Amino acid sequence: AEAMKCCHAGSSLELNAIMVNLLCKLDRPELAEKQSKMMQQIDDDSTIAQLACAWAHCASGGKKIQDASYIYQELGDKYKWTPKLYNGSAVCSMMMGSYDDAERDLLEAIALDPKDADTLANLAACASHLGKSSGRFINAMKQTGVAHDALTKISALEDDFERAAAHVDA
């Protein structure tokens, strides 16, 4: 709530982008879209406004995912592809069910930064959908030392499994 107050008080594109990100995390895609449109009215060509638009489109889902994918493609082609842009493109591909395309983007991202925790987490998810082992990506993520959300969830699931197994054995 405090972060939203701070973002709402400012009028910079950066603060607006943080607000879009917060709204996406709060599962309020309609408000994220509205905030993104406000940013585009300020400066439609700015990279940060385009990224915020892609985030809002991903959160909205449906046909807007393709629009988000186009934004990531345009930014990667216009500037330089980064692991974050590859990850954004891969997430769009996964949301559209194109796991082979997602894997291709993620392998490009991991070639640029082999220790990027987001890329490793997305590779693990993508591998699972492709019927491949995700263990090496999870292990690599653990070795980065980054406290990633995916690792927290995996740890909680492992704990739940251990508790359930203990009840079965008892």
Residue ranges of each PLM-predicted region?
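Structural motif corresponding to the intra-repeat A-B loop/turn of tetratricopeptide repeats
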Residues: L26, S60-G62, M96, L130-G131
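Terminal, low-structured helical/coil segments at or just beyond the last alpha-helical repeat
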Residues: S133-A170
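Start-of-helix register in tetratricopeptide repeats
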Residues: E14, L31, I48-L51, K84, ...
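Residue-level recognition of tetratricopeptide repeat
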Residues: N21, W55-H57, V91, A125
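Long, repeat-rich segments with strong aromatic
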Residues: Y70, K78-A102
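Solenoid-like repeat scaffolds
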Residues: M4-L13, S36-D45, A59, Y70-W81, ...
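TPR/TPR-like alpha-solenoid signature
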Residues: A17, L51-C53, N87-G88, M94, ...
